[in-house]
Amino acid sequence: MAIIRGIVLYTRQYKDNDLLVRILTETYGMRTFLARGAKKATSKLSAGTQPYTIVTFDGALPKRETGLGYMNDVQDIKVYSRLIEDIEANAYAALIASLIDASFEEGEKITRWYNQLYVALQKLDEGLDPQIIANIFEIQLLVPLGVAPNLRADPITGQVDGKFDYSEKYNGIISEHHFNLDDQRLMLDQKTVFYLRQFSVIDMRQVHDIKMSAITKRGLQRVIDYIYEKQVGLKPRAKSFIEQMHSWQNTLVNFRRNK
């Protein structure tokens, strides 16, 4: 038995009243725990199995890397109310959780990412822009996902200042002096390039109220989506839901304008 602390990423039903709980633990990496009876209304485990809850529990680690652990008794929980009540914040939290889950092996020690996610959930609960929080994860998780685009300097000259654009051909940014080498570059505006580069290295603790225009947000999301489609080949269900949600919002805005 052990006292285990972690962040609940998601749950899956297992038999009638049991749940499989996917948890990013503080110490033991990504693990799946069986919570017997957690779906019962009277279960003491119920509150500790809600997605994006910080939970400390008495349990057992899997005996094998791919096996199940057990959640026996919840000691302490921290719940973020906005992530329950705000559908947009909840959707972006789900996207971040899906990407982290896809990026690392079972049991791989990823304390840095535990800390990043812990702070990110706090930021989301405080009302910071959920798209910006998710964009930071989308960009930084490209490295463990095996893409690792070069966003630091021009690959030909090492230039770090000036105007840049994103090139799939060169797997990252190229300076304006080499725009002619790739006629398929993304033609990004410089504010988008700035945030793309900044978000690749920023620590979540440094993120405060970032103000970004709607145009720049769309541009940044466009390049991120391009990289995930063309180079990663990953699109979580939460991503599709977010796109549908934005489509509904745009339809509603246009309807109100035309009334």
From Swiss-Prot:
Keywords: DNA damage, DNA recombination, DNA repair. One of its GO terms (biological process) is DNA recombination. The keyword DNA repair applies. Pfam families: RecO_C, RecO_N. InterPro entries: ARFGAP/RecO (IPR037278), DNA_rep/recomb_RecO_N (IPR022572), NA-bd_OB-fold (IPR012340), RecO (IPR003717), RecO_C (IPR042242). The keyword Iron does not apply. Involved in DNA repair and RecF pathway recombination. This is DNA repair protein RecO. It comes from Leuconostoc mesenteroides subsp. mesenteroides (strain ATCC 8293 / DSM 20343 / BCRC 11652 / CCM 1803 / JCM 6124 / NCDO 523 / NBRC 100496 / NCIMB 8023 / NCTC 12954 / NRRL B-1118 / 37Y). The lineage of its organism: Bacteria, Bacillati, Bacillota, Bacilli, Lactobacillales. The gene is recO.
